[in-house]
Every structure is written in C-alpha cells, then in structure tokens.
C-alpha cells in the first residue's frame, strides 16, 4: 500500500492515505479498483496495494524483452515505434520481426495521485511519456468539494 522507490528512502506522497489503503482488506475493494496495470493476473497479479518491482524507462536505456516483461513495455514500444508488439510463445515480435532487446527513445514517468484509494493514475494507465507532462503544480490556490454544502464546499486543508 505504500509508494516506494529504491532511489529515494523518504516518504513519497501522502503517508496517511497510503496507510489507509494498506489497512483495507482486499475484499473491501471492487476488482476493477483493486487490479492494476498491466492487468495480467496470470503473470503478475498486481494490485494498487502491491505491484512491482517496475523499471521506469529512460531515453537510451536498453532492456531485454521476453514473454514476461513484454506486456509491461508493450504500450511504450508501440507508442515510440508506431508498430505492433506481440508475443509468440516466448518470442516478442515487433511488426512480425523477432526482437530480444529494445532501446527507449524517450523518458517516462509513473505518477500516483494523492487520493490513493480513488485516483485514476499510472497504477491503471501505465507509463506517461515526458512530452505529455505540461507542468508542475506548485500551489493549490482553490479546491472545492462538489459534494459539500455551500458553506463547507471549500477544502481548506488542500490550500498550501
């Protein structure tokens, strides 16, 4: 239930929300909420509470493609090449040609939202190409709860 990165030892994100998710029994979450990218229960069985390890691609890095990890990087390879990555038995194929390694052309990110239990983020969507990142939120100046009353609709705890 806790976000972690082997290159950073501190807390990533909202530890309270992550603790709340970690304490929730899996049975309390609907399967479409619990299951996570790449949605291959037979090979991975990853959930929003327990997934990884997962290498996040950087431009120039090369990985070996095999029948186990091709599904993790299929969308990235297809995005970068415009081709189709399939797996025939144990042999990944790009546009029908056997491929055993792939060198990434772009940098990618893996974003997770602060509303850990109900955030449609990379745990569902997969990697985000760097060129899709258009900015960084430095300050939240106004946040509104659409389900609050007129007087209690502002989320003052979110203003930083």
Describe each model-derived feature in a short phrase:
Residues 1-160:
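Extended hydrophobic leader/signal-anchor segments used for secretion and membrane insertion
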């Amino acid at each position: 239930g806790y976000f972690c990165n082997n290159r950073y030892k501190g807390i990533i994100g909202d530890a309270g929300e992550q603790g709340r998710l970690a304490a929730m029994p899996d049975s309390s979450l609907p399967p479409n909420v619990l299951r996570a990218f790449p949605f291959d229960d037979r090979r991975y069985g990853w959930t929003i509470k327990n997934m990884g390890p997962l290498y996040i691609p950087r431009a120039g890095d090369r990985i070996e493609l095999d029948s186990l990890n091709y599904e993790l990087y299929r969308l990235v390879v297809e995005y970068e090449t415009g081709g189709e990555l399939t797996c025939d038995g144990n042999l990944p194929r790009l546009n029908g040609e056997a491929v055993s390694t792939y060198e990434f052309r772009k940098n990618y990110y893996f974003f997770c939202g602060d509303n850990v239990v109900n955030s449609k983020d990379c745990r569902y969507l997969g990697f985000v190409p760097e060129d899709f990142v258009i900015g960084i939120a430095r300050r939240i100046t106004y946040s509104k709860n659409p389900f609050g009353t007129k007087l209690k609709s502002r989320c003052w705890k979110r203003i930083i």
